[in-house]
Amino acid sequence: MTHQTHAYHMVNPSPWPLTGALSALLMTSGLTMWFHFNSMTLLMIGLTTNMLTMYQWWRDVIRESTFQGHHTPAVQKGLRYGMILFIISEVLFFTGFFWAFYHSSLAPTPELGGCWPPTGIHPLNPLEVPLLNTSVLLASGVSITWAHHSLMEGDRKHMLQALFITITLGIYFTLLQASEYYEAPFTISDGVYGSTFFVATGFHGLHVIIGSTFLIVCFFRQLKFHFTSNHHFGFEAAAWYWHFVDVVWLFLYVSIYWWGS
């Protein structure tokens, strides 16, 4: 490394933003092909490219931060601001879905039968699987906080235990959501109710999968002693993201499952 007289990380040119963008294009195009033509070839290529990009980009960032020491306090401050702004953008993303839901449900049009849920729609019981899902995510919020406090106190064993519990609960939530979708008495094509329900809860489910991926990476990094009590922004960002996913679900549960039913 050449000598530098400032605390900032001058990032080397990287191909991963480009391959990541191309993999996103392939995945969205692949989803369209799967939905309309029942062909998963393009989707699988997109997913594979995305997995390879994630692995190699994470590898580079871990090398730069943990082994080369580029993540100085000044760099970490910038990363924190970046993560906060990213979560704010995600809040606005979900605000759009809640807006669509309340726009349709607070003043149902004659086409919907003048009522909500629309005529012919049998909504899911909010006291069955959705309530279990709420309990699972709230429990995972407790366990991720336990993991964070254990890490700050230097308790590696309890940090790994709590993180493993959080990941398990995240995967369990995803499986419950998948079973709920499979058994739902309506589909995404059942008018505005079906589309707002599946798009809002589906994007939340995608965020749970992304958050679980972040936490799995943190788990393997902690197994390799990458985090210390005062240098663990990778884990902190994942924990913030998980709490965001948790809060969004509470709004989804109260709005769409409970009030909307």
Swiss-Prot record:
Keyword Mitochondrion annotated: yes
GO cellular component: a single term: respiratory chain complex IV
GO molecular function: cytochrome-c oxidase activity
Residue intervals annotated with topology Mitochondrial intermembrane: 35-40, 106-128, 184-190, 257-261
Its EC number(s): 7.1.1.9
Reaction equation(s) it catalyzes: 4 Fe(II)-[cytochrome c] + O2 + 8 H(+)(in) = 4 Fe(III)-[cytochrome c] + 2 H2O + 4 H(+)(out)
Topology relative to the membrane: Multi-pass membrane protein
Highest taxon above the source species: Eukaryota
Subcellular location: Mitochondrion inner membrane
Residue stretches spanning the membrane: 16-34, 41-66, 73-105, 129-152, 156-183, 191-223, 233-256
Intrachain S-S bonds: none
Gene Ontology annotations of biological process type: mitochondrial electron transport, cytochrome c to oxygen; respiratory chain complex IV assembly
Primary location: mitochondrion
Keywords noted in UniProt: Membrane, Mitochondrion, Mitochondrion inner membrane, Translocase, Transmembrane, Transmembrane helix
Record topology, Mitochondrial matrix segments: 1-15, 67-72, 153-155, 224-232
Purpose: Component of the cytochrome c oxidase, the last enzyme in the mitochondrial electron transport chain which drives oxidative phosphorylation. The respiratory chain contains 3 multisubunit complexes succinate dehydrogenase (complex II, CII), ubiquinol-cytochrome c oxidoreductase (cytochrome b-c1 complex, complex III, CIII) and cytochrome c oxidase (complex IV, CIV), that cooperate to transfer electrons derived from NADH and succinate to molecular oxygen, creating an electrochemical gradient over the inner membrane that drives transmembrane transport and the ATP synthase.
Recorded family membership: Belongs to the cytochrome c oxidase subunit 3 family.
Quaternary structure (record): Component of the cytochrome c oxidase (complex IV, CIV), a multisubunit enzyme composed of 14 subunits. The complex is composed of a catalytic core of 3 subunits MT-CO1, MT-CO2 and MT-CO3, encoded in the mitochondrial DNA, and 11 supernumerary subunits COX4I, COX5A, COX5B, COX6A, COX6B, COX6C, COX7A, COX7B, COX7C, COX8 and NDUFA4, which are encoded in the nuclear genome.
Name of the protein in its database record: Cytochrome c oxidase subunit 3
